[in-house]
């Protein structure tokens, strides 16, 4: 829905403020995700985590029809409470269930399913709003479609298999301890929070959260309703392609060593994302003076503004896949993965809450774009060192495999002797 630009609303300030509240509550419940999962399991946590989304969409629908704002805030609070649990457990499932050499593609599959919902929603929105070549809000039927789709989340979540019932293709079982007391869980979370891996990834996750307020506000400020609907659809399409590109770069053996693939993928993402944010600041500086209204009917002006938005979505998906691939290779099981996922997604949602709060003031978009660019360059060295940690773990695993192979050869020689 945010792919429509501030949820398809005419008022960026209202939805940005509501999203700030939503993500503030999500920050709390993200950190509580491992505790709830220990009690009721992955399946029920995922299903219950989806119940707030249709309430959020219903609030926007009510505002669209009546102009009332209270339901928007109510829906944001309810969505924030439930979605934090959803976010923490979905990340653990995507990073902890697959084998190490498949994790990039499994993460891409996870984001593809999420983008598939955006593609469906974007298609519906584009079909309903394709004639509205002015700025404003999307039609109310758009929200009805979103509410119907989101209500299916609870049902489909119950089809998930808990980790202890999953067997990987290589025959290994997944360890996911249950019944851990809350004091022990809190102790493990505190220990992980102070670890080098979390500290190195924190700047990148804060950046990743902070930037999410900007693209939708940019879209709502400068583009017509039908162009925003097109943006919602196309952002899901390019996001899916980008996350698969990142997943294949780290998984497909185009280079023999996974260490080489990790470093090369990081460099590729760093270069593309750096260029995108420099371009975004340049375009935004121009638009603060010209204040255009962009529509695909005027392709010469539309293409530049829409192009930078597309690249922001492309690089967002590249970074998203890569950071979760890092998590998946720093943790060894869904039990560990849900702690990594909860902590880092909690940091991400805190960044999102602050980002939307700042944008709701409102803040000049040139300032927001410049801060986004600065945060990216600030997070780069930390992200590189996090990549180095993953490479070191790969080296350790290789040494362990070589030692086991050598031990097996010695055993064979002894038996023959």
Model-based region annotation:
Residues 111-114, 139-160, 267-274, 368-389:
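Symmetry-related core transmembrane helices of the 12-TM Major Facilitator Superfamily/SLC fold
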Residues 13, 44-60, 260-280:
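Structural signature of the two symmetry-related core transmembrane helices
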């Amino acid at each position: 829905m945010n792919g429509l630009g501030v949820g398809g609303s005419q008022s960026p300030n209202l939805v940005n403020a509501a999203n700030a509240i939503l993500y503030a509550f999500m920050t709390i419940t993200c950190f509580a995700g491992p505790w709830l999962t220990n009690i009721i399991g992955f399946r029920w946590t995922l299903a219950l985590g989806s119940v707030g989304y249709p309430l959020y969409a219903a609030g926007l629908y009510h505002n669209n029809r009546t102009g009332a704002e209270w339901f928007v805030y109510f829906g944001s609070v309810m969505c924030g409470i439930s979605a934090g649990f959803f976010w923490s457990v979905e990340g653990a499932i995507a990073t902890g269930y697959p084998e190490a050499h498949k994790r990039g593609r499994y993460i891409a599959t996870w984001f593809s399913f999420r983008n598939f919902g955006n593609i469906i929603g974007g298609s519906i929105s584009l079909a309903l709003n394709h004639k509205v070549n002015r700025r404003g809000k999307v039609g109310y039927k758009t929200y009805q479609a979103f509410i119907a789709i989101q209500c299916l989340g609870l049902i489909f979540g119950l089809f998930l298999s808990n980790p202890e019932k999953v067997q990987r293709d290589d025959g290994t079982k997944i360890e996911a301890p249950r019944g851990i007391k809350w004091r022990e869980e809190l102790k493990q979370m505190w220990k992980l929070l102070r670890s080098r891996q979390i500290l190195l990834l924190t700047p990148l996750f804060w950046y990743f959260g902070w930037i999410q307020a900007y693209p939708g506000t940019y879209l709502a400020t400068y583009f017509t309703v039908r162009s925003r609907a097109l943006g919602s659809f196309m952002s899901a399409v390019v996001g899916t392609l980008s996350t698969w590109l990142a997943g294949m770069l780290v998984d497909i053996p185009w280079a023999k060593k996974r260490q080489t693939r990790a470093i090369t993928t990081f460099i590729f993402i760093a270069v593309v994302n750096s260029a995108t944010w420099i371009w975004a600041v340049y375009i935004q500086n121009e638009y603060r003076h010209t204040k255009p209204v962009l529509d695909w009917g005027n392709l010469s002006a539309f293409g530049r503004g829409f192009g930078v938005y597309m690249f922001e979505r492309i690089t967002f998906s590249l970074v998203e896949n890569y950071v979760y691939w890092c998590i998946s290779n720093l943790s060894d099981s869904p039990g560990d993965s849900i702690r990594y996922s909860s902590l880092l997604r909690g940091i991400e949602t805190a960044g999102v809450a602050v980002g939307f709060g700042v944008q709701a003031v409102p803040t000049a978009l040139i300032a927001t774009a410049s801060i986004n660019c600065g945060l990216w360059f600030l997070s780069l060295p930390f992200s590189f060192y996090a990549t180095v940690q993953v490479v070191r773990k790969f080296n350790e695993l290789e040494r362990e495999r070589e030692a086991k192979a050598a031990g097996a050869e010695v055993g064979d020689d002894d038996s023959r002797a």
